[in-house]
Regions:
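Second-shell loop/turn segments in exported
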Residues: 17-23, 50-53, 150-157, 183-189, ...
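Structured segments of extracytoplasmic/periplasmic soluble domains
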Residues: 1, 5, 36-40, 52, ...
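Extracellular/periplasmic bilobed ligand-binding domains
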Residues: 2, 60-157
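Segments of small-molecule ligand-sensing domains
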Residues: 175-192, 200-256
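Extracellular/periplasmic periplasmic-binding protein-like sensory domains
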Residues: 115-195, 250-264
Length: 266
């Protein structure tokens, strides 16, 4: 069996009896972000930007658009070619359309470029990123810039003090660990999720009483584990049962994430 950590596309576990995941799914994430945009940011016009042909971007934009329009809002969506490095025209378009929020669920490399371009253009429209944006890369790209960034994610530092302390001690114990974490000991959600996935695997091994793959696979369906990112159990397709996401705001002046809300889809 396999346990996915942050693979949010619904198709990952579809029709597969030995693939599990501990994260929420894109339909949930897209809805949560749309609700946050309308309920907390008061947005009625959204500009969505993604990479052309990228299933992750396309799927999340679709889910966001469905929920945002259901809330009474209007959505304009555009897609850039793979390898694009200049986002000036896209951000100009967002302003031209009167966007009150920008949703860009793209990869980290593009996220960093979008942050830099937004800062250079003086974009004040709030930018929403998906779970991929929860990274030190985004923190560094936006440092000192007068831009507003929110992301949806699986964990907020401070959620489990014991885990936080242990992770930071491990990071700071080795220069290679520190370098691999972008030179600091900030805890991104994927680190906490990776830890929980590992612990879920151990729980399945203990329940199975064996290292036999079939026995471990059978045991996984019934695993219930209180992780650092929340309670974990699996539904009939192997997906984790999750009902909330963490929305974080980036304090660009101090290069730190702050918890903005714990948001559900309803």
């Amino acid at each position: 069996p396999a346990i996915g950590v942050t693979c949010t596309n619904p198709s990952v576990t579809a029709g597969n009896t030995h693939y599990f995941r501990i994260c929420f799914l894109d339909p949930f994430q897209g809805t949560v972000l749309a609700n946050y945009a309308t309920e907390k940011l008061g947005a009625t016009i959204a500009y969505c930007l993604g990479e052309l042909g990228n299933d992750y971007d396309t799927g999340l934009i679709y889910n966001f658009k469905q929920a945002f329009e259901k809330n009474g809002g209007m959505v304009v969506d555009e897609y850039f070619q793979t390898g694009n490095t200049d986002f000036t025209s896209y951000l100009t378009n967002a302003s031209m359309y009167g966007a009150q929020v920008i949703f860009a669920p793209c990869s980290l490399a593009y996220a960093a470029l979008i942050c830099s371009a937004a800062g250079a253009q003086g974009v004040t429209t709030p930018i929403l990123g998906s779970d991929t944006w929860d990274s030190n890369v985004v923190v560094d790209a936006a440092a000192g810039q007068n831009i507003t960034i929110y992301v949806s994610t699986f964990y907020q530092e401070g959620g489990s003090p014991e885990f936080d302390a242990g992770f930071k001690a491990w990071i700071n114990s080795d220069s290679v660990h520190l370098a691999n974490n972008n030179g600091n000991d900030m805890i991104s959600a994927v680190s906490a999720m990776g830890y929980d996935a590992y612990m879920v695997a151990l729980e399945a091994l203990k329940a199975a009483g064996s290292k036999d793959p079939k026995a471990v696979n059978a045991a996984l369906w019934d695993v219930k584990y209180d992780g650092v990112t929340g309670a974990i159990a699996f539904d009939e397709t192997g997906d984790a049962i999750r009902d909330v996401a963490f929305i974080k705001h980036l304090d660009t002046a101090n290069s730190a994430w702050e918890l903005a809300a714990v948001q559900g889809k309803d």
